[in-house]
Every structure is written in C-alpha cells, then in structure tokens.
Amino acid sequence: EANDTELIEGFKTLYKVPEAKIKEFVEPIKIADYFHEEIKSGMIEMGYSIDWRREFTTIDPAYQKFIEWQFRNLKEKNLIVQGSHPVGWCPKDQNPVSQHDTLGDVEPDFTEYIIIKFDLDGVKIPVATLRPETLFGVTNIWINPQVTYQKIKVNDEIWITSPECARKLGFLEKKIEVIEDVSGSDFVGQSVKAPHSSDSIVILPASFVKSDNGTGIVMSVPAHAPFDYQALVDCKSGKNKSINSDLLSNIQNIEPISMIKTEGLGNIPAKDIVEKMGISDQDDPKLEDATKEIYSKEFYKGILADNTKQFAGKKISEAKDEIKEWITKIGTADILLELTNSPVKCRCGAECVVKLLTNQWFLDYSNKDWKKKAHVCFEKMNILPNEIRSEFDKVLDWLRERACARQ
C-alpha cells in the first residue's frame, strides 16, 4: 500500500534504513537493490567464500532467457497446460497470488464446497457443504435472522445468499446481479423442497450461522452434526426468541434422521457427544471439537444406511464423490470455492479471494507422474536437519496447478 506507515516504520526501526533511502523506495527496484547490497555486504563481513563474479538477479536478461528455456522444456513435456483452475487472487492488483505475494508469507489455501439448492417457490435457497452425503439426513434449513441477505440473479436463477457469498461467486465466472437486500428473519418459518425428496422442510433461525462462511445458509443434519443438534434443541425448547408460538408448536415433531452407521457411535451420535461434553447452547465453543470428532470417525468408518437410496451400504469415503456427481446431474448442485485460512492479505493490503481463471496457462504440479519423479529425486537428497524431510514430502503432495504468470 502506498505510504504504508507500518511498513515505513519497519524500514526505519527494524532495518535501520536511512530516511533518504526510504524516499527512493517508491520504485520497487530500489527496494530490491538496497537489500541486495545490504545482504551482500553482510556476507562479505562474515567471511563467506563466494565468487561474486557469478552474481546475478532474477531480472537480468541472461537469467530471463534461462527461465524461458525452462518453460519451453516444460511445455514440450506437457507439464504446462491450458485450462480453467482456481487460484488465490488479489482483487486490487488483479493478479494470482501465492505464498510470497502475501503478508506474512501465507499460502492461500482453499477447498471446494458443494452448493445444494433447495427450492422456495422458484427461488433457490443454496446451502454450501463439505459433506453432500448428509443430504439424506436433512430435517430443516438454518438462517441467521440478524443477517441482511441479498436476493441475487445467478446466471438465469434467483438465489438468496449473504453479501459475502454473492461477492465470492462473482470471482467464479458467474454472472451476478444484486436485486435487493432481504432480512434473514423474513424467511423464518417458510418451507423449502429438498432436491432428493418431495417433502417440505422448514427454515429455522440459528445464531451460529455466519454470513462469511459458505452461502450464509446451512442445511441441518441434527443426527450427525453437533451444531445442528444443539440448535434444534434450542429452537424446540423455546430458547430461541426468533420463533413465535405457532412455529414453536409446529417444530416439536422434528426429529433427527439417522443415515450413517459407524462402529463405536450410536444412531444419533450428535446427541450423544453433545450430552457427553455438557454442551447447553449453540454458541458453546466445544461444538467445534465435537464436530471434528464425529466427522472424522464417520468419514473413515461410516457406512450409509438404508434410507440413502442407491448409495446404501457404501462407505462415506467412497460414496461422497458419487453423491456429489448425482446431485450435480439432477441440476440441483453448484460449486463454491472458499479460502480455508482466511483472511489472507496481499502485500498491497487487499484481502485475497479464490478466483477461477479460465483459458490460462498453468504449471501442472498436480501431474501424478511428475510428483512421483520429484519424490524419487528428493529421496536421493541430503536434508539438514533430517527432521524437516517430511515437510518437503507434504508440499510435493499438496502442490496443484499454479498460474505461470501474474497477468
């Protein structure tokens, strides 16, 4: 950020840069030149035996030719590919960003949510989930009555989402038009139809629903999700003041639907763990730990029950992608890409997002054969200290397509 007082103060106090030099830093190359000479002089003072005749920088013409040679070779080996891939993105600089482009050297890490669209008289109520297999256990929808949502046009459909979600969708190659603001409280008590059933389910209020997470609307699976179970208990007990007396009476018959069988867990594992941990309301921080414990066990050991249509008897770990494909085929699903370690800020100060880059060139770090060769080469290397060897292996495993250039 221009005239960043914190950065300027760091130059003065931490790096002892003279005031006159700082004024020259309006040109980025001047910053690089200054610290280049500072680091070099420090190495000379420490007596490093370095042949400085071989000195170069990454913007030297000769080095740039070397990089061009590398890219030509990678393209010949089909390791540079063209396509559409998600990247960390600075909306201000209009550039892809990776670890060294962010404040604090944070690698933008993101995950793919499945959006499942519930229908409210032709208007889509989209929920984002990492667990599409739990669709068969949905009893209701959660919305935060204190949040101002937006009615938006997404391509040819009308959706209700949080403003934060509407903005994220705009970076994912979707045509977004904001129609109007709407209050979450307006939807409490209304009914929607689920994509897998002709039954109607009710929209209920919940304070744990965050507008900056997913679509700002959540599907409720109280048998297997501790947050959902406790929020349902709060609603049925009359603790939630956003529920009027008529709605309170109507929701008393909502019961958790068990749809996953897991060795070591009961039929309603969310209820069991909430009671075991002494959780008494939906804002209890212990719900995070309860959620992680159940989800981990169900993912690796869970089997889908008989009420999950053609997926009954399959392991969660195997059926998850199949269910995602099924929901997509029947036209009731979409994709939302979300940063998992937000907020991530670009060095310019702007908050980064996930953007879907189309028809761009990428280094195909997801290529399995390339990863395999990299692991073989790495095994032959001496690493000091050896304790960090595993960290390199992890990086090789998680690396995926990366944009070749900033613009």
Predicted regions span which residues?
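Protease-associated
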Residues: 132-217, 226, 230
